[in-house]
A protein has these predicted regions:
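Extracellular beta-solenoid/beta-roll
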Residues: 9, 195, 267-270, 338-345, ...
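Outer membrane beta-barrel translocator domains of Type V secretion systems
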Residues: 647-832, 837, 843-845, 960-980
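Fold-core signature of tandem repeat domains
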Residues: 7-12, 18-20, 24-29, 46-48, ...
């Protein structure tokens, strides 16, 4: 476009180039940045030469508008990816994500920088009246890269709006900048006469700011190495000078805020006159509206005024004197600092030498009491008081949202009081002989704290104990409320208030409390226990409640079933109602081995007085109470009270333990057996016999333990017996055989109660030794068999509530005789008669509810019957083996084996059985003795086979059944296999 020529509209694409010496209007440029942004190698796009003019140009992605010296453009709009390289003049450029590079000699006026746009003002370039709307999206003082305005040259009258940022590089200068809320100016170079209207100015190391005016919500931050001069801070403005920063000739107007520490340098004037912070010394500083002064270790501050919104932070080892605290002023300190001055109410306070006196901590204030130090008469009005041990002396007051945080063990021997609003006591441990006083309508929350005080006086409002252990009595006024939440444990009495126990909370009521526990309304989902440190005579405890709302909470009551009067802790419902469901857990506080049968209504555990009512189901028994021979159950009576009564039936352990005598003696008798149960081979040689027997044994229900009968039972047994002959000889026409045997066995029997319900199981592991003597008259065949046996029993009785173990010894003697008659050559009939006498001694023991003593047990048995069986010659003879060497020791088929069979019916009579089992103590009425009888008659049928399978080996099998026909005699069935080897 030649000089004097005008071109309207047009588009430059695909490396097109337009050289403008005249005037170009409305061009669209989409090419020119082939070598990247602001690269001198680019040759495309629109070039405005000396004297050339371009108006209303649109530069899109990849497009370049280059304005050389002497050229001028106006109203250019540059989109993302497009750029304007300026060495001439540009007016009213709009950067919609595009970039403007203002080179030396270039002047940009009225540029508007929108989101993601960037204006770079290089050394020797000038930008005036720029509006910056981008660059700070990453937050205050964040490095966002190439967005916003970067000044290496000069920027004049820049306006920085929300999200806008101006970065003044070390060689750059910004003059008369206005920064609004949400925008900021970052200064590494020079900033002159900046006005902060809600925006921020950051003066970095090496940067300077002069003449800054900080208006409402504006904030000037002078960082380490930064310098600010002649700053004016108006009402609600803020000047922050970091450690190592410098601000001089500051004018701090009323309501303006200074934020600094004694590691900075600040001088100027405030409403009190000249002030300074120089070389670790601060003087005459005013703190308000967010102002703050940190007095560091070893530094000092004098004549500090702390008004509403101001904060004075005196670090450990720092000193602040002549401090004047106004209403709303904040003090941060610990007991290692030295602070003195006046409170907002004009009263003097001090901190020093490990002693803090008369502190008043307003909202936001914080004081830390170190271990070994003392704080006297501290008032916390919404502030934070942290005690890392130490002692609270005088009256410590918490009001209006105050927090007292404990770590370690803190001692209070005086008064901790809450007068207004809410307060929180949390963590650590508060001990001593002091008291806690709660007044006012608010709530005091004690959380995660161990609190041990002389008393807690709940005069008004609510006390909430959360996840804490509190050991003290709570003395309350009616209309107040006490809440136990989380895993709180309260050890102390309560009198009187409305109490709520959450499901994980526990209230332990001691018998040495200063007052009796009385509660108005009790909402109960936790646990309540009566605790006692007394020894000697039992003294029942009482909890009195007007209204009880049970929410599956538990109350543990001590009961003395062995006492006729004054025998239980009580819950008293006084004039109100008991609703919901409360579980009563009963603790036997007496001799667990002793229990009396209750009389009348029973043992009272819930008493309804003054017209009180209790819902059906308001109380349930949480556990079985057993004492002596009795179970005790909870019952509601017509008077609305609740009682424990001994049940008519004995507890399940009575028949269970009584059956142990019978079970052990049954086993001994079965093991001993009789001669007809032993497999033998006539001859001159001794033999060894191995027998394995198992079976079922039990007793029918013949009235049960209440009628003196053996309890109903059913179970199994098994044993292995090894016996061997020691002597075989002939004496005066008689064959004499003597030997010994040993056995190991086990029995397991399920026992039933008198009502047919399961009582439990008795298991017995037994080991036995015995001897026998057998005499046979050779001429007549008359024989006699004598057996003596001893057994060690290890027994365990298991019920739903007990595992009871006992050991003992059983003995047995047996005399049996028989005379065989030959009916035919191979058939024999043998009448038999047997007498058995046995005894048992079991050790005494004790279960969870009583002692158990066993008297000596004994029984006598007579068996009469006969044996009918074959009587073949048991000589082994010759076999049919094809090998001569085996014909004397082997058979080819079963039919060649010598076999005898037999059957044995009998009648067994048991008589003179004895065996006492007693439970309880010697106290009158508590001891119960049971003597289950085993007397009775049973029918027994046994049958067996024996076969000789080798010259010296005989195998026998046997099965039998016993049926009780009268009394409590045993019944069952059995099976046995025997291996007999002669040698």
């Amino acid at each position: 476009v030649q000089a004097g020529e005008t071109v309207n509209d047009g588009t430059l694409t695909n490396h097109d180039n337009q050289i403008v010496l005249g005037t170009a209007n409305g061009m669209t440029i989409s090419t020119g940045l082939e070598y990247g942004p602001d690269n001198e190698a680019n040759t495309g796009g629109q070039w405005i030469q000396n004297g050339g003019i371009a108006n209303n140009t649109t530069v899109t992605g990849g497009g370049l508008q280059r304005v050389n010296a002497g050229g001028s453009v106006s109203d250019t709009v540059i989109s993302a990816g497009g750029g304007q390289s300026l060495q001439g003049q540009a007016v009213n450029t709009t950067l919609n994500g595009g970039e403007q590079w203002v080179h030396e000699g270039g002047i940009a006026t009225g540029t508007v920088i929108n989101e993601k746009g960037w204006q770079a003002i290089k050394s020797g370039a000038v930008a005036t009246d720029t509006v910056v709307n981008t660059g700070a999206e990453g937050g205050p003082d964040a490095e966002n890269g190439d967005t916003g305005q970067t000044v290496y040259g000069d920027a004049v009258r820049t306006t920085i709006n929300k999200n806008g940022r101006q970065i003044v590089a070390a060689e750059g200068t910004a003059n008369t900048t206005g920064v609004y809320a949400g925008g900021d100016q970052t200064v590494h170079g020079h900033a002159l006469d900046t006005t902060l209207n809600g925006g921020y100015q950051y003066v970095h190391n090496g940067g300077t700011a002069s003449g800054t005016v900080v208006n409402s919500d504006g904030w000037q931050i002078v960082k380490n190495g930064g310098v600010a001069g002649n700053t004016t801070v108006n009402q609600k403005g803020r000047l922050q000078v970091d450690a190592g920063g410098t601000a001089t000739n500051v004018t701090l107007k009323q309501g303006g805020a200074l934020v600094t520490s004694t590691a900075a340098t600040v001088t100027g004037i405030n409403r009190l006159g000249a002030f300074s912070v120089v070389e670790g010394k601060a003087d005459n500083v005013v703190l308000e509206n967010g102002g703050r002064l940190d007095v560091l270790t070893g530094h000092t501050a004098t004549n500090t005024r702390v008004d509403d919104g101001g904060t004075l932070d005196v670090r450990n080892g720092g000193t602040a004197t002549t401090v004047s605290m106004g209403n709303g002023g904040v003090l941060l300190a610990d007991s290692g600092a030295a602070v003195s001055g006046t409170r907002s109410d004009g009263k003097a306070f001090s901190i020093g030498g490990g002693q803090a006196d008369a502190l008043m901590l307003e909202k936001g204030s914080s004081f830390t009491l170190n271990a070994g130090d003392t704080a006297t008469d501290t008032t916390v009005n919404g502030g934070l008081f942290t005690a890392r041990g130490g002692t609270l002396a005088g009256t410590t007051t918490l009001n209006n949202g105050a927090i007292l945080t404990l770590s370690g063990k803190t001692v209070n021997n005086d008064t901790l009081t809450i007068r207004e609003g809410d307060a929180l006591l949390q963590g650590g441990s508060l001990t001593g002989n002091g008291s806690v006083e709660k007044s006012g309508s608010g709530t005091l929350t004690v959380s995660n704290t161990t609190l041990t005080q002389k008393a807690v006086n709940l005069n008004e409002g609510t006390l909430t104990l959360n996840d804490s252990t509190v050991t003290t009595d709570v003395i309350a006024q009616r209309g107040t409320a006490l809440k136990l939440t989380g895993s709180t444990v309260l050890n102390g009495a309560i009198d009187p208030t409305n109490v709520t126990l959450a499901s994980g909370a526990t209230w332990n009521i001691p018998d040495n409390a200063t007052v009796q526990s009385v509660v108005d309304d009790l909402s109960h989902a936790g646990q309540i226990h009566f605790t006692s440190t007394r020894t000697g005579k039992f003294v029942p405890a009482t909890l009195k409640v007007k209204n009880l709302n049970g929410q599956n909470g538990t109350i543990s009551l001590h009961v003395r079933p062995d006492m006729a009067q004054n025998n239980a802790d009580r819950l008293v419902i006084d004039g109100g109602r008991a609703t919901g469901k409360t579980i009563l857990n009963l603790v036997n506080a007496g001799n667990s081995a002793s229990g009396l049968a209750t009389s009348g209504k029973g043992i009272q555990v819930v008493e309804a007085i003054n017209g009180a009512t209790t819902e059906e189901g308001a109380f349930i028994q949480g556990n079985k109470l057993q004492a002596g021979a009795f179970n005790y159950s909870l019952n509601r009576d017509s008077d609305e009270s609740w009682y424990l009564r001994s049940e008519n039936a004995y507890r399940a352990e009575v028949p269970l333990y009584a059956s142990m005598l019978t079970q052990a003696m049954d086993y001994d008798r079965i093991l001993a057996g009789s001669r007809s149960h032993q497999t033998g081979v006539s001859g001159e040689n001794n033999s060894v016999r191995l027998s394995i027997q198992g079976g079922h044994l039990g007793h029918d229900n013949n009235g049960g333990i209440a009628r003196g009968a053996t309890p109903e039972s059913s179970g199994s047994y098994g044993f292995v017996r090894l016996e061997g002959d020691l002597l075989r000889t002939e004496v005066a026409g008689m064959s004499v055989t003597a030997g010994v045997y040993g056995a190991a066995g086990h029995s397991s029997v399920d026992v039933k109660d008198d009502d047919g319900s399961r009582a439990g199981t008795v298991r017995d592991d037994a080991g036995s030794l015995g001897g026998y003597l057998n005499l046979i008259h050779n001429a007549s065949g008359l024989w006699a068999d004598i057996v003596a046996q001893g057994t060690r029993h290890s027994m365990k009785a298991s019920s739903d509530n007990n595992d009871f173990r006992v050991r003992g010894w059983g003995w047995l003697g047996s005399l049996e005789t028989g005379l065989p008659f030959s009916i035919t050559d191979n058939l024999m009939l043998e009448p038999q008669l047997q007498y058995t006498w046995q005894g048992l001694s079991l050790d005494d023991g004790q279960d969870n509810a009583s002692y158990v003593k066993f008297g000596h047990g004994s029984a006598q048995h007579v068996r009469a019957g006969f044996r009918l069986g074959s009587h073949h010659d048991m000589n082994f003879g010759k076999g049919t083996s094809s090998r001569d060497t085996l014909r004397g020791s082997a058979k080819h088929s079963v039919r060649e084996l010598p076999v005898n069979w037999w059957v044995q019916p009998s009648v067994i009579r048991t008589f003179s059985s004895r065996g006492d089992m007693s439970m309880g103590t010697a106290a009158a009425g508590s001891n119960m003795t049971f003597s289950p009888s085993q007397n009775g008659t049973s029918l027994d049928l046994q049958a067996g086979l024996e076969a000789r399978v080798r010259e010296n080996i005989t195998l026998g099998v046997q099965a039998g059944y016993v049926h009780s026909v009268s009394g409590s005699s045993a019944e069952g069935y059995n099976g046995q296999a025997t291996l007999n080897v002669t040698f």
